[in-house]
Amino acid sequence: MRLKSSRLGYLFLQFMTLCFYTQMTMQSISMPNFKHHVTEQSRLSDRMSRRLTRTYQLYSRTSGKHVQVLGNKRVNANAEDGDIHAKLVVETDTFGSRVRIRGAKTGYYICMNKKGKLIGRRKGRGKDCIFTEIVLENNYTALQNAKYKGWYMAFTRKGRPRKAMQTRQHQREAHFMKRLPRGHLLTEQKPFDLIPYPLNKRTKHHQRASVN
C-alpha cells in the first residue's frame, strides 16, 4: 500500500512538471516581441497618424546661445534668448523619439547633407531631415541624424556648425537643452498641437477602408 502511494505521488509530480513545462513553452511561442516591434517601427516614418508638434528653443551647451534657422537657409547657434529665428517647431516623425525640426519664422527644416553640413530646406520629408532625440545622463539632449548614423547636430563655441563626421554623442558640442521662448510661461505651452500629415494614396485607401 505504501509503495502504491509513493508511485502515485511520483506520477503526480511528473504530471505537474509536464504541465508547467508545456505552459511555459506556449507562452514563449505566443508572446509577441514588443521590443523588436518598437525598434522596427521607430525606423519608419509614420504616415498613417497625424504628427504632434511642439515649439521651443534649443540651447547649445558650447556656444551658450540658441540654434536658429535663417532666411538664407543657414543654421547656427548664435541666437539670443527670445530671438524670432530661435523659435523652433519640432514635429514627431514616429511614435518613437524621431523628430523633424524647422524654424517657425522661415519654415526651413534643419537637414544634414552627405558632407555632414547642416542646411535649411523647404521640404523636410527625407531621412536626412530627421533626427533621433537621445536624452543623456546629464539631462542634455543629443540629436543624431536618421540617415547618417553616428552623425550628430553640433556647434562650436562660436556657434558655427561642426562637420557631423567629427561629432560624437559624449562631446559638449552635441549637447542641447530644450527651453521655452522668452515670455512664454509653462502654463501657456500646450502639451502638443496636432497637424495633419499630407495624404498619399495608401493613406486615403486606409481611411476609406476604416469608414466602410
UniProtKB/Swiss-Prot annotation:
Name of protein: Fibroblast growth factor 8b
MF terms in GO: fibroblast growth factor receptor binding; growth factor activity; type 1 fibroblast growth factor receptor binding; type 2 fibroblast growth factor receptor binding
UniProt gene name: fgf8b
One Pfam short name: FGF
Broad class of where this protein is predominantly found: secreted
PROSITE patterns the record matches: HBGF_FGF (PS00247)
Residue ranges of the TM segments: none
SUPFAM superfamilies associated with the record: Cytokine (SSF50353)
InterPro entries named among the record's database cross-references: Fibroblast_GF_fam, IL1/FGF
GO biological process: dorsal/ventral pattern formation; fibroblast growth factor receptor signaling pathway; midbrain-hindbrain boundary development; neurogenesis; pattern specification process; positive regulation of cell division; positive regulation of cell population proliferation; positive regulation of MAPK cascade
